[in-house]
Amino acid sequence: MDFGKRISIEAVEEGNEFMPKFDDRGLIPVITMEESSNLVLMHGYLNKEALKLSIETKQAHYWSRSREQLWKKGETSGLYQNIKEILVDDDQDCVIFKVEVEGSGASCHVGYKSCFYRSVENFKDLEFVEEEKLFDPEGVYAGQENPTKL
């Protein structure tokens, strides 16, 4: 599978061909949303291989910047993200995956449904908007390095 060649602004903005624009590291950001509710589940990155695999298999694959490797969401946890729709923005430098999540429906490695489980109150303090974890990350990811970096 090859993506379209970016030959004109008009073709990128108004055309019918998918011509994703990857950054200088070969990545494009992706926002992943629950199809049924439009809840934002996570933000990640795709390289060409991850995007191609996601399209071909209809299961979300991502590029991990912290581990510098391709990963299929749900491979360890069983919480696979089945892609129902892919949207692209006007200049094709960001995509949205609308997904249905298997199992408990969680997408966050911390155990919550959404990685956006806290809101910023008063522009400085964090308040939990999700209070209940849908799975125990210690049980699911035992022995694996936490992907969060300081």
Which residues does each PLM region occupy?
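C-terminal binding/interaction regions
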Residues: 2-27, 34-41, 46-150
